[in-house]
Amino acid sequence: MPTDLNQILDVIRQHGELAYSFVFTYAATNSLLMVLLAGYAAHLGAFDWGKLVMVCWIGSFAGDAVRFWVGRRYGSKWLSSFPRIQRMLHTTARLVEHHHTWFIFLHRYPNGIRSLAGFAFGISSMSNASFLILNFISAGIWAVTTVSAGYFFSHLSD
């Protein structure tokens, strides 16, 4: 198990495609921190910045699209055994109904909201086409800004 930064960077370089797959998975779930760290590693040469942005963009888009589909297909009924989460989902859905355009651009940043937002978009009245278009644009902005923030932080810390 690698214990210092140089060893971690070497592992990333040796297992490049697997490392990109790992970042894709985290971008699809909800890890802002992992993408920031990957941007940091890109500045140090372990990842290609452009490829990393694309992987994060597609991962973020795909993760929210899957959550949207689940919300659209199953609603919130499948959460009936988790009443607290179901309440949080309905609160998030109310935000989506009133502020769907702004919310789709901002939901990726605060901790805890992203996990539920895709489902909330799915149970909202937002059309599939509107969601997919706005989600695609939002995921791209998120990927560029988050990877770049990690990249430039690494540049500043040199």
Predicted features along the sequence, with ranges:
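Membrane-helix interface motif
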Residues: 137, 145, 149-156
